[in-house]
Curated annotation (Swiss-Prot):
Its main location: plastid. The keyword Protein biosynthesis does not apply. InterPro entries: Domain_X (IPR024937), Maturase_MatK (IPR002866), Maturase_MatK_N (IPR024942). It comes from Rhamnus cathartica. This is Maturase K. It is found in: Plastid, Chloroplast. GO terms for biological process: mRNA processing; RNA splicing; tRNA processing. Belongs to the intron maturase 2 family. MatK subfamily. It comes from the Eukaryota. Usually encoded in the trnK tRNA gene intron. Probably assists in splicing its own and other chloroplast group II introns. Keywords: Chloroplast, mRNA processing, Plastid, RNA-binding, tRNA processing. GO terms for molecular function: RNA binding.
């Protein structure tokens, strides 16, 4: 057990205990302000106006020195409903600045000398997920579809941070922020309170949730690494999507001290694959349903007894890869077998063998996309294009530009689809809806409008992704053309639209 105890040993020299004084530093709010400016235009900004200058910040810090603006009465709910509204500008600025401060102990954890770990400053980094989606799963049969439960009480999030943030004042301030979004005395935190918190201060919510998920995954992935034939020499690179810069070493040796040998015999699986994004994770294995059920109930007991989180076994599904598809990252994924006949010739005999090659198909989910377009009044519930009557007051250029931007974003996001048929259908709905909107504006039919202006009017704006690649790389167009027929993953798809967050 000495090896495992060293693995979970805390790096005391890396801990930083004085975070609370940073609240009075002007550059902290400049970082938070710059983070807000760099967010996607499609993400709703419900915070304060990002165009405010640092003059407001200086005035705010001066008032913090003179008065105690951090104390907010719990009975003052009528004046300060939530930090996200403009009624309490200073509290909103504190919460966004605090979100930058609590990331410092994690961001300063540099890898040991002699190792090279790529740093990704975006905490929503999904770069490690693409190799999972490109895997052929040659020996894997079952998938464990896991919905990670939320903590029933927000105090659990504060307790998790105590291992890293030793400043008691900062922890009390965090409790004050969380108190604004839920009744702290209540035993259960409602889903509505979590939703308000995630929309008002997404950076702080993302950090707290990643810290919570990281704690349980530090146990789960440690078990996975010990049983795998492909042990990793640098876990910080592969599990970058879970940890910020390196593997967080939490002292959980007491969990394995007594029953680790038994756990190792039960969960021995050399080909376990694991991936997570936000609140959904997958464990893919080649073993029997019995082992997958053991993993299922182990996760349930781990959440309930180690993290005091109520987990329902019904939120964890065991599916056969060849018969069930699973939704992940806004895609509908399933494993398909390609059968091919191979003839083997010897000196005397010849044999015909069936060779099955597995491939993970990633498709654009047609039904949810049509439902989203119908909700936005681009088509009917059956997928028939209709005119967008609310846009008829805009100019022709503005109408075409709006439709084209949606079409380009969808093409960019779903460029990783192994089959483009569903994507072409969605683009057809958007183009015909655009034509019907223009025809409605000019009080004519679609046929008359196209005869008058010609179909070339839309070609300039609805540029195919393949044509864009040919403009960027004209000399290697033939290579990119063959590449585009396959799957192309863009690393910025989370920032383009929030389809992935609507799962």
């Amino acid at each position: 057990m000495e090896e495992f105890q060293r693995y979970f040993e805390l790096d005391r020299s890396q801990q930083h205990d004085l975070l609370y004084p940073l609240i009075f530093r002007e550059y902290i709010y400049a970082f938070a302000h710059d983070h807000g400016l760099n967010r996607s235009d499609l993400l709703e900004n419900v915070g304060y106006d990002n165009k405010s200058s640092l003059r407001i910040v200086k005035r705010f810090i001066t008032r913090m020195y003179r008065q105690n603006h951090l104390i907010i009465s719990a009975n003052d709910s009528t004046q300060n409903k939530c930090f996200g509204y403009n009624k309490n500008l200073y509290s909103q600025m504190i919460s966004e600045g605090f979100a930058v401060i609590v990331e410092i102990p994690f961001s300063l954890r540099l890898p040991p000398s002699g190792t090279e770990i790529v740093k990704y400053y975006n905490l929503q980094s999904i770069h490690s997920i693409f190799p999972f989606l490109e895997d052929k799963f040659p020996r894997l049969n079952y998938v464990l579809d896991v919905l990670i439960p939320y903590p029933i009480h927000l105090e659990i999030l504060v307790q998790i941070l105590r291992y890293w943030v030793k400043d008691a004042s900062s922890l009390h301030l965090l409790r004050l922020f969380l108190h604004e979004y839920s009744n702290w005395n209540s035993f259960i935190t409602t889903k509505k309170s979590i939703s308000i918190f995630s929309k008002t201060n997404p950076r702080l919510f993302l950090f707290l949730y990643n810290s919570y998920a990281c704690e349980y995954e530090s146990i789960l992935l440690f078990l996975r690494n010990q049983f795998s034939h492909l042990r990793l020499t640098s876990s910080g690179v592969f599990f970058e999507r879970i940890y910020f810069y390196g593997k967080i070493k939490h002292p959980v040796e007491e969990v394995f001290a007594n029953d680790f040998p038994a756990i190792r015999r039960v969960f021995k699986d050399p080909f376990m694959h694991y991936v997570r994004y936000q609140g959904k994770s997958f464990l893919v294995s080649k073993d029997t349903p019995l082992l997958m059920n053991k993993w299922k109930y182990y996760l349930v007991h781990l959440w309930q007894w180690h993290f005091y989180v109520w987990a329902q076994p019904g939120r964890i599904y065991i599916n056969l890869l060849f018969k069930h598809s699973f939704g992940f990252l806004g895609y509908l994924s399933s494993v398909r077998q390609n059968l091919s006949l191979v003839r083997s010739q010897t000196l005397e005999n010849s044999f015909i063998m069936d060779n099955a090659i597995k491939k993970l198909d990633t498709l654009a989910p047609i039904s949810p996309l049509i439902g989203s377009l119908a909700k936005m009044q681009f088509c009917s519930a059956l997928g028939h294009p209709v005119s967008k009557s609310t846009w008829t007051d805009s100019s022709d250029f503005s109408i075409i530009n709006r439709f084209a931007r949606i079409c380009r974003n969808l093409s960019h996001y779903y460029s990783g689809s192994s089959k483009k048929k569903n994507l072409y259908r969605i683009k057809y709905i958007l183009r015909l809806s655009c034509v019907k909107t223009l025809a409605c504006k000019h009080k004519s039919t679609v046929r008359v409008f196209l005869k008058r202006f010609g179909s070339e009017l839309l070609e300039e704006f609805f540029t195919e992704e393949e044509d864009v690649l040919s403009f960027i790389f004209p000399r290697t167009y033939s290579t990119f053309r063959s590449l585009y027929r396959g799957r192309v993953w863009y690393l910025d798809i989370v920032c383009i639209n929030d389809l992935v967050n609507q799962e």
